[in-house]
Amino acid sequence: MRQLVPGKLLPKEEIFAVNLGVSRDTLRKALAILEAEHLVRRVKGHGTYVTDAIPKRKITLLLPCPDEICMGSYHLLHYLHGIQDACCKLQCELETLAVSPTNNIDDIDWKNLFNLNKDSLVLVYGYWFMKIFPFLVASRCKVLLTHEQLRYDKYDLKDYLKLPDWNDFLLNREDEAYKMVRHMYESGYRRPAFLMEYLNEDDNIMPVALRAACDKILPGYKPPFYSAERTTNESTIIKNIEKYVIKENCDCVFINLGSYQDVIQRNYPDLPCGFFHRNSIKEFHGNHKWFYSRFDFVKIGYQAVEQLLHGNEATRHRVFQCNIYDYQTEKNRKDGEL
């Protein structure tokens, strides 16, 4: 078929069948197969044409709001990088759909979602989108959810993940917590403090996982825990460090906020520090006493596209683990290189 010029009108069935030496019934079956593969298209009242090109499959990435790409954190940008790379290499299109104009799940722009259907391949990152999951089910989309491990099951998430068209990639935070505490111990530190965002949230698995790791690696030690607020106020951050780290005679601190990283670098340059969930060495101003965890979101994004396009039952539910890096061994890595 590809020996014919794209856009060419094929002969009428009776003539084409004679030319090919087959019956008209056989020809009709063959044309039906070619049409299903987008190699020909039938135009009622005109005939059958050779297609100009085979339509690419489309990957749809849902975003909370139109500005999410500009505002997004490193992990989302790296995830998108992997998705774009996969779409380019696997010859499919990528579209992004903003769910809400105001970044509010109760203010959904439904008209942006109405084109989703049984042929749609949809990527979802995080639990923010759960209120539209029933809509995605009703639309019969094929969905892949990338999400972090939680302390408790999130509502009826398990029911969604049992559906045959739903896939998920889980980020193992328990493993991350254990690896970070173990790395701290192997580096010679024995009295950590944890000043991290979200430690007071009930469904956050990290407080439980971090305490379990400390109980196993540092039996008898009860580390200070403080659920840090997102702030750039240096005096507030210093006050928290003095209270929970310095006065408690801690020899290492774990953080997950960039503002704490900056303040520690300026005011406590000799304080060993573990940074959770860091995805790029770019703008990471560590020293030889710093280490960090990183999930390979470029790889995760790439494999998410592969799963939607070609995945099978055996790969529907996957668990990803992080790696731990010392800043002193990673500082020569080029920006953006993973």
Language model features: what each stretch is:
Residues K12, H46-K58:
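Short, cationic-aromatic polyanion-contact patches
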Residues I54-L121, C214-Y221:
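Amphipathic helical "hinge" segments at domain boundaries
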Residues Y178-L218, T315-N332:
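An alpha-beta-alpha
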Residues E242-L338:
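Flexible loop/turn connectors
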Residues K158-F194, I237-E242, S293-A314:
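Hydrophobic alpha-helical segments within soluble ligand-binding/sensing domains
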Residues Y127-E176, H277-W290:
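Flexible loop/hinge segments that line or gate small-molecule binding clefts
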Residues T60, K118-G126, L144, A193-E197, ...:
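Periplasmic-binding protein-like
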Residues K8-K44:
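N-terminal helix-turn-helix
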